[in-house]
Amino acid sequence: MLAGARLQRRRRQLQQPQQPRWRQPLPWPMNADPPPPPWVWMVPGTAGLLRLGAGVAPPPVLLASAQPASAPLLPRLPGWPAPGEPLLPLLPLSSAPDHAAVHHYPLLHGQWLFGGHSPSIGLAPSSAVELVPLFPHVCPSTLSPPVGKNWIDKRMPNYKIFFNNPFALDSTWMYPEESVLFHSHEKTHFLANQVTPSLSRPTPASRPLPTVVLAAQPIPGGCHDSLKPISRGPTITITAATAAAAATAMVSVDPEELRGLSPSIMQPCHFLTLTPIRIPFRTAPFSDKGKEHSRAPRSPALMLRAPERKSLVGDKEDKEPPPILVRGEETAAKGNKPVASTPVPGSPWCVVWTGDDRVFFFNPTMQLSVWEKPVDLQNRGDLKRIIEDPPHKRKLEASATESSDGSSSDDGSEDQSVKTKRNRTESCEGPGPEDTHQVDKGPQTPPPQILLPLEERVTHFRDMLLERGVSAFSTWEKELHKIVFDPRYLLLNSEERKQIFEQFVKTRIKEEYKERKSKLLLAKEEFKKLLEESKVSPRTTFKEFAEKHGRDQRFRLVQKRKDQEHFFNQFILILKKRDKENRLRLRKMR
């Protein structure tokens, strides 16, 4: 019984006329990738401006009159040199965005701005806002998006259409034949007389809005399929009046009755020629500099530039002398210059003192100067002693002691010094008439410095290398920090310094090798004495010995760890041999 009732119910449902099922269109969130065509774009029944968020731009549009919701797809247009995807007319909406259908299919990231025939809408200029004019019953084409942001020319018989990535903010300027730029106060005159105004520049603004002219063009006879010729279409004008204080956008629609239309056939369409003149929004200076070089050559450009501001004190600025480049050494204070340096033993760092008794650390291998103590020198106990004992103060103290010794000399020497001082003051009392005449002529040049002969300078430089302990086994760059602050360093130029350094290294390397060998022998003897005094047994290890006697000065004389272990192992072998010999003797005695 239940099965029969179900079958009867199913037959009744099949006999009833079924209503056509319409696929509910899905809204496209504009922050996501676009779906595959065809697209349906819901717009209200009145004209207005749509303000979109950054990066959102509609596809190319086709202006059409009212059509029913169930209108079929338009077939491919003959003579259209583009892929043959069809055009899908949009569903007409009755009124403004208050309608329920608009809320049902919202345009995300958009805000509708509407008004009467000539509303004044105040908009704050912003680089993240795009203004798109929308008109009732607009059909987006499913043509492939244009490459680049260049204008693509789509032609039909006796007709021309410009498509672009609409209102994409860019710093390029396209100049089609229909481009017109005018002020907002010229709009009324333009609409009344239908005369194209002359090109004029708007008043400069910090961030102007784009100025766009949209004009509907009639399609002459010879259109195909459902496209019919139209005598005149409505003229739509959008202008942007720029000013320093604020910017406003004007939209006006001048409707006229369309003539020559037949109600029996499909409602005619007419195309819209889009000719924007875009003023770029610059968020930062020189932001588009890199793009200009990478762009290919384009059609003639229209450049709008604000007039340069002339300063009121321009004459004074012209009279001012040009700036003079001065070396950092001349501008730096004398107290900031380095006075002396001392290398820290066992590390690549050296301590440098300045004239104002400040201390910084310099690494010549890395060419690095640091005011704070480096990590390598954090646990050095001798660093404080080095900082507290600067070498330049030692010299001052030594000179002060010498002067004090000289002051305790006999009275005769004091009388002689007084006489010499008197003679100096008498000779320097005042210049004679000839001297005053020379002084009046101009500033005297300082007397030329007498240079020592080259041989003496070379000997002084060699003495400096010996005194500073420059190693013959090192390089010029590593040893530079030892000699760069010595006044004798400046006796030679850079080429002569390096030549003498190379000669010094060649002659010095043999002597230094002998010195190193003798030092190593002395250190070895001292190390053996330490081993003998420590009473090491053959079973003790080097680690135990180093922990116990590592702070001894004789242990530190041998600097390399390998040498220390080698000497220790040699001593242990000698001890083992002695033990064996002693055991053999004891066995023989038994």
Swiss-Prot record:
This is Transcription elongation regulator 1-like protein. InterPro entries: FF_domain, FF_domain_sf, TCRG1-like, WW_dom, WW_dom_sf. The keyword Isomerase does not apply. Keywords: Repeat. PROSITE patterns: FF (PS51676), WW_DOMAIN_1 (PS01159), WW_DOMAIN_2 (PS50020). CDD domains: WW (cd00201). It comes from the Eukaryota. Residues 1-29, 285-344, 382-450 are annotated as: Disordered. The keyword Repeat applies. Residues 14-25 have a biased composition (Low complexity). Residues 145-178, 343-376 form the WW domain. Coiled coil: none annotated. Residues 306-332, 382-391 have a biased composition (Basic and acidic residues). Residues 454-507, 519-574 form the FF domain. Pfam families: FF, WW_TCERG1.
